[in-house]
Regions:
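Positively charged, low-complexity intrinsically disordered leader regions
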Residues: 2-45
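C-terminal binding/interaction regions
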Residues: 6-23, 87, 94-161, 279, ...
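A short, flexible beta-alpha/helix-coil linker loop
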Residues: 31-33, 70, 169-170, 247-250
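Acidic-glycine-rich active-site phosphate/pyrophosphate-binding loop
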Residues: 35-46, 158, 235-243
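Short, glycine-rich nucleotide/cofactor-binding loops
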Residues: 38-44, 169-173, 250-257
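Small-aliphatic-rich amphipathic alpha-helix that forms the alpha element of a beta-alpha
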Residues: 49-56, 263-266
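N-terminal active-site beta-alpha-beta segment that forms phosphate/nucleotide-binding
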Residues: 53-224
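Conserved phosphate- and dinucleotide-binding cores of soluble alpha/beta proteins
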Residues: 192-193, 198-377
Length: 380
């Protein structure tokens, strides 16, 4: 996606790989929208930490990061012993797999890398195949998002007001995004519409990331408090809801996504507003049979009890230079604790359709069309 920074417009991808340095290059998303910065992780443990600490986040982006991280770890191995190489790669795999448990993209991405590297007869061959597979996963992520945009743009009409939740934009994928892909495609088609970005507490990824993306692309939008969505729906000010997903169950059509998605789905159903989920094929979990079994990440209570932001110097009389920096501010009662589940699960009966690279499907169509959607296993 094109980004204008320091008066210059350039095309960036969220995740890339530096072969010369054997490093994964990432947009430091925790600094947005106040600062645009590229960072490099020099080894697979640093790459896993970047996923855990949310330097990079979003289903496709952490999938590509994990794929590159596995290749990075494989390339760091020194020696020719295939058995020792296998043990090393398995260690790398487990470290990256445990970085964030709810999203399935990292597991699917790394399984793909392992599958493609296995025919290699030597360590060097497997290292080469690992990086080639990671690069192909990243390219496929972009192709899937492009297809989602084409299919999803048909849902958007002139004058629509569209609600989205959290960030399922290009920052959450290698490029383009899922929930935002129909918006970008519709904009290219000349359609005029307005987007409401849920702030998406506690990390405010709608307010910081989605709003920043839409501003970069000159798309009409406003940030709303999470609790305002129902009011706007009740007043007829929302025509369509499009969200992303961190894990969608192929057998049931249940969708795990950022906390608050289920609430928006309930509200949309109450007000008869179409509710769509946009996903690449790598987000589909073909193994789990019920949403209750999806591991829900519990994050630090500090995210709920306070917030990061840029200090507004206009509110202070002092010219202290420290006020130019980002700061964490506690807003909650100092003696209270908090619960911070990062995700919730939306049942299929609340979902109008799932926008996939092969078309817009009903949740119950995923399993019958599993071969077309990339399922390669057995069972029913």
């Amino acid at each position: 996606m094109n980004v204008t920074t320091q008066g210059r417009t350039r095309h960036f991808r969220t995740v890339t790989f530096d072969r010369a340095q054997n490093a994964v290059r990432l947009i430091e998303q925790r600094l947005l929208p106040h600062e645009f910065k590229i960072v490099a992780t020099p080894n697979f443990r640093a790459t896993a930490a970047a996923i855990t600490d949310m330097v990079v986040r979003g289903a496709g982006a952490i999938g590509a990061t994990a794929a590159y991280g596995l290749a990075q770890g494989a390339l760091a191995f020194r020696g020719n012993d295939l058995k020792k190489f296998y043990v090393h790669v398995e260690t790398v795999y487990q470290v990256l797999k445990n970085a964030r448990p709810t999203a399935v993209d990292p597991v699917n991405a790394m399984n793909d890398v392992r599958r493609h590297m296995s025919p290699g007869q030597t360590v060097a061959e497997r290292q080469f195949l690992a990086l080639a597979a990671a690069e192909e996963f990243a390219r496929e992520d972009v192709r899937h998002c492009e297809a989602i945009g084409r299919h999803g743009a048909r849902l958007i009409r002139n004058g629509m007001k569209i609600l989205t939740h959290c960030n399922a934009g290009w920052l959450a994928f290698v490029d383009i995004g899922t929930a935002t892909a129909p918006l970008y495609a519709a904009q290219v088609q000349g359609k005029k519409f307005h987007v409401f970005c849920d702030e998406t507490r506690p990390r405010s990824q709608g307010a910081t990331l989605t709003a920043w993306e839409l501003a970069q692309q000159n798309i009409s939008h406003q940030i709303i408090a999470d609790n305002a969505a129902g009011h706007l729906m009740q007043r007829g000010e929302v025509d369509l809801v499009i969200v992303g997903s961190d894990r969608t169950l192929g057998r049931t059509g249940e969708v795990a996504n950022k906390i608050g998605t289920y609430t928006k789905a309930v509200l949309a159903a109450r007000h008869k507003i179409p509710f769509y989920v946009a996903i690449p094929l790598s987000t589909i979990d073909w193994n789990l049979k019920r949403g209750f079994d999806i591991p829900i990440e519990e994050r630090s209570e500090s995210e709920v009890l306070g917030a990061w932001g840029m200090v507004d110097k206009s509110k202070f009389k002092t010219q202290n230079s420290k006020l130019k920096q980002r700061a964490y501010v506690r807003v909650a009662n100092p003696t209270s604790g908090a619960r911070n589940p990062g995700f919730d699960v939306t049942p299929p009966e609340l979902i109008t359709g799932i926008i996939t690279p092969v078309g817009v499907l009903k949740p119950q169509e995923l399993w019958p069309r599993r071969r077309e959607l990339g399922f390669s296993g057995q069972g029913g």
